[in-house]
Swiss-Prot record:
Record remark on domains: Consists of two distinct domains, a catalytic core and a N-terminal extension that is involved in tRNA binding.
Record function comment: Catalyzes the attachment of serine to tRNA(Ser). Is also able to aminoacylate tRNA(Sec) with serine, to form the misacylated tRNA L-seryl-tRNA(Sec), which will be further converted into selenocysteinyl-tRNA(Sec).
Organism: Burkholderia vietnamiensis (strain G4 / LMG 22486) (Burkholderia cepacia (strain R1808))
UniProt-annotated binding residues for L-serine: T235, S236, E237, E289, S388
Predominant cellular place of this UniProt entry's protein: cytoplasm
Pathway membership, UniProt: Aminoacyl-tRNA biosynthesis; selenocysteinyl-tRNA(Sec) biosynthesis; L-seryl-tRNA(Sec) from L-serine and tRNA(Sec): step 1/1
InterPro entries in alphabetical order: aa-tRNA-synt_IIb (IPR002314), aa-tRNA-synth_II (IPR006195), aa-tRNA-synth_II/BPL/LPL (IPR045864), Ser-tRNA-ligase_type_1 (IPR002317), Ser-tRNA-synth_1_N (IPR015866), SerRS_1_N_sf (IPR042103), SerRS_core (IPR033729), tRNA-bd_arm (IPR010978)
EC number: 6.1.1.11
Positions bound to ATP: R266, S267, E268, E353, I354, S355, S356
Listed Gene3D superfamilies: Bira Bifunctional Protein, Domain 2, Serine-tRNA synthetase, tRNA binding domain
Family from the record: Belongs to the class-II aminoacyl-tRNA synthetase family. Type-1 seryl-tRNA synthetase subfamily.
Name of this protein: Serine--tRNA ligase
GO molecular function: ATP binding; serine-tRNA ligase activity
Length: 433
């Protein structure tokens, strides 16, 4: 959530910066609510002052033995008007809150202004795409004989679900374990196991609600009269970031660095017809997430560090990639700045997103009321960052495509072999003649 004081000081300036993000701020609606709020607060202050004056007058009158009934009646009337004003003010504050909850974060000044992914800026590349001396297959054709089972996944749960079997399932697990070990042993993160189901207020904290309810899987329990609504997490960023919700963290505890391996559940409501083949876009997929909670003056250094942590995974796997700075129109709702890592997929002859690392500054912290005590001992909002380290399914796709062999086998990257019992290659089972 944005700082409402910023809107009050520079409404037109905020509207301009939100327009760069493709969001049209209803300036008239905000101004009208603010005017009404100020009028009520001014009137309430006047009433409070009048009531205080009358209370003193009543005391003096009683000391003189005078009749106070008329003054007492006026005080009672003031009390009734103040209660009505409180109700009205609460309604206005609620409408302001609803308006604020729908506003995306303001982009950092270093973010390129643009409309969509066509305006993103490439920063750097690492690795050289492999030159194949045979016809390259995509991950579906490579993986199906090795244990990718799209047919059973669809039979069990419908489109965009996949079952993994045998060595492919083991390779998927090996990737997640390798990522966790790298982040915990080399990058200083604390491994965390989180709930996969969370309450609605948790999603308000990280910005998925109210705007993206259609992208979430909702879970309801209880009878018709006592229904409890919860949601499956779309990323463990949600649960990891909310661990500091409604708390004041000691400055000495910062930075807090958490990582988790979890399934992620997304309805992909706006993705009809996109990436329908294979594992690129799934309703359920695994991801190793990185979250940092830091002091405001260190958050952009932390963002660079987090990008480096995601890059390290790709480099250790020997997968070519590039780093992209997202433009204002392509960033996620809560982000102030985002870097995407895109891995090379030879069958598509292009780079595809495999990690997204974002600094939300105080946007999520304000919604969660997550604070720390600064050097002056005063509570101050923390900054929160999140990043994929990496999406496990898409990393599996990249390994299958980049490490495929002409005979249909897949070479296991060296860093994964300890997690695969020393296996160097995944071969398709021999078909009976």
């Amino acid at each position: 959530m944005l700082d409402i004081q910023l809107l009050r000081k520079d409404l037109d300036g905020v509207a301009k910066r939100l327009a760069d993000r493709g969001y049209t701020l209803d300036v008239a609606a905000f101004s009208a609510l603010e005017a009404e709020r100020r009028a009520i607060q001014t009137r309430t202050e006047e009433l409070q002052a009048r009531r205080n004056s009358l209370s003193k007058q009543i005391g003096a009158m009683k000391g003189k033995g005078e009749d106070t009934s008329a003054v007492m009646a006026e005080v009672g009337g003031i009390g009734d008007e103040m209660k009505a004003s409180e109700v009205k003010l609460g309604e206005i504050q609620s409408r302001l809150s609803d308006l604020m909850l729908g506003m995306p974060n303001i982009a950092h000044e270093s973010v390129p202004v643009g409309k969509d992914e066509a305006d993103n800026v490439e920063l750097r590349r690492w690795g050289t795409p492999r030159q194949f001396d045979f016809d390259v297959k995509d991950h579906v054709d490579v993986g199906t004989p090795l244990g990718l089972d799209f047919e059973t996944g669809a039979k069990l749960a419908g489109a965009r679900f996949t079952m993994l079997r045998g060595p492919i399932a083991r390779l998927h697990r090996a990737l997640a374990q390798f990522m966790l070990d790298t982040h915990t042993q080399l990058h200083g993160y604390s491994e965390t196991y989180t709930p996969y189901i969370v309450n609605p207020e948790i999603l308000y904290g990280t910005g998925q609600l109210p705007k993206f309810a259609d992208d979430m899987f909702r879970v309801e329990k209880g009878g018709a009269e006592n229904t409890i609504t919860q949601y499956l997490i779309s990323t463990s960023e949600i649960s990891l970031t909310n661990t500091v919700r409604e708390s004041i963290v000691d400055a000495s505890a910062l930075p807090i660095k958490l990582t988790a391996h979890s399934p992620c559940f997304r309805s992909e409501a706006g993705s009809y017809g996109r990436d329908t083949r294979g594992m690129i876009r799934q309703h359920q997929f695994d991801k190793v997430e990185m979250v940092q909670v830091v002091a405001p003056d260190t958050s952009y250094a932390a963002l660079d560090e987090m990008v480096g942590h995601a890059e390290a995974i790709l480099q250790k796997l020997g997968l070519p990639y590039r780093v992209i700075t997202l433009c204002t129109g392509d960033m996620g709702f809560s982000a102030a700045k985002t870097f995407d890592l895109e891995v090379w997929l030879p069958a598509q002859n292009t780079y595809r997103e495999i990690s997204s690392c974002s600094n939300t500054e105080a946007f999520q912290a304000r919604r969660m009321q997550a604070r720390f005590r600064n050097a002056q001992g005063k509570p101050e909002l923390v900054h929160t960052l999140n990043g994929s380290g990496l999406a496990v399914g898409r990393t599996l796709v990249a390994v299958l495509e980049n490490y495929q062999n002409a005979d249909g086998s897949v070479t296991v990257p060296e860093v994964l072999r300890p997690y695969m019992g020393g296996m160097e290659r995944i071969d398709a089972p021999v078909q009976a003649s």
